[in-house]
Design a protein with these regions (language model features):
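Long, contiguous binding/interaction regions
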Residues: 1-47, 52, 69, 73, ...
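Short hydrophobic/aromatic beta-strand micro-patches
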Residues: 62-64
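Active-site cofactor/substrate anionic-group-binding motifs, chiefly glycine-
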Residues: 78-89
C-alpha cells in the first residue's frame, strides 16, 4: 500500500477531532434545531457533521414530515424558536411547495422533506461520508 493510501486509511478510521468552543456552540444550535423539529413530530431526524468533508457548511439537519403542511409547520417552529438566540436564516427555499424546505443558517443547514421527496433526493446517500452525530 502506498504512503498516500495508507494515510487515507488512517485518516478515514481516525476518531473525529475534538470540537472547539465555537464548534460546541454550533453543535448545540444544531441539536436545538433538531429538537424543535421533534416538537412538531418530525420523523427520522438525522444530524450530519460535514466540516471534515466540505467547507460550505458544518452540519446538516435532515428530517421528514408526513405532509407539506407538516413540513411547513416544522420549518416555522425551527425559525421561530431560533430567533431569540439571534439566529436568522440566511436563505430559505422550498417553503411554498413544502416538499423540500431548506433553511440555511450558514454554519448549518436544515433540510425538511416529505417522505417521498426524501427518498427521491436521498441526501443520506449523497453525503454518506459525513459523520452521523448522535
Amino acid at each position: 500500500m502506498s504512503n498516500n493510501a495508507n494515510q487515507e486509511e488512517i485518516t478515514k478510521n481516525a476518531p473525529p477531532a475534538p470540537l472547539s468552543p465555537v464548534d460546541e456552540e454550533i453543535l448545540a444550535q444544531v441539536r436545538f434545531a433538531a429538537a424543535c423539529a421533534e416538537e412538531k413530530k418530525a420523523e427520522n431526524i438525522l444530524i450530519l457533521r460535514l466540516s471534515a468533508i466540505t467547507e460550505f457548511s458544518d452540519y446538516f439537519v435532515i428530517c421528514s414530515g408526513n405532509s407539506t403542511r407538516q413540513t411547513q409547520a416544522i420549518a416555522d417552529e425551527i425559525t421561530e424558536q431560533l430567533k431569540p438566540y439571534k439566529l436568522r436564516p440566511l436563505h430559505t427555499e422550498g417553503y411554498a411547495t413544502g416538499d423540500w424546505i431548506l433553511i440555511d443558517y450558514g454554519a448549518f443547514i436544515v433540510h425538511i422533506f416529505t417522505q417521498s421527496a426524501r427518498q427521491f433526493y436521498d441526501l443520506e446517500r449523497l453525503w454518506r461520508d459525513a459523520e452521523r452525530v448522535v
